[in-house]
Amino acid sequence: MRLQGVRKEDIMTTAPRIARLIRPLVVALALAGVPALALTSASSATATTCATTVAHWGSLTKSLSRMTSAPITNVRAGRNACFDRMVVDLRGKGAGYTVRYVPQVLTQGQGAVIPLRGGAKLDIVVKAPTYNINTGTSTYHPANSRELVNVTGFSTFRQIASGGSFEGYTTIGLGVRARLPMRVFILDGPGTGSRVVIDVAHHW
């Protein structure tokens, strides 16, 4: 392959000259203790920084006042590079929520304390039932009400427990490592369903 406008002899004479210019710079950086990939590493670190100071993140109460009769069908959780996520699945749309840090999470209707592992506790109230309001038939059947999801190995989550469902309100207790930034939002789908999403950051 021939490069237009560039002669072979130009390349042969220019390459050593460039090498002589670069070598002192590399040596100087090494003596200064700067790794060769420092700039690349810094750039990569900036790109992967977890932005928990932007809008919607924080440790104060998050709420949405609307309510729905669309029932809850599942609770699940997953891990992200910057946060742990809990998802409440609903068979329909329109759910509201109140999520806040509290000294103790109490069950719906009875007010009994829910024991939770972790240095801080999130009281999650989803404004939707876990049953069909017309028939009373349960729509969510966890195998263990004290361990709705196995969160072993999670960075922030320590325990997810049921607080029951009463008069269209459902409580879930989330034990976390410490009082860390969180955000809550609604996602539509799949299909005609929707999801209440709670993210809790790994760090401030």
Write out the residue ranges for each language-model feature.
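Short linear recognition/processing motifs and adjacent strand/loop elements at protein termini
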Residues: 44-204
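Secretory targeting and sorting signals
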Residues: 8-47
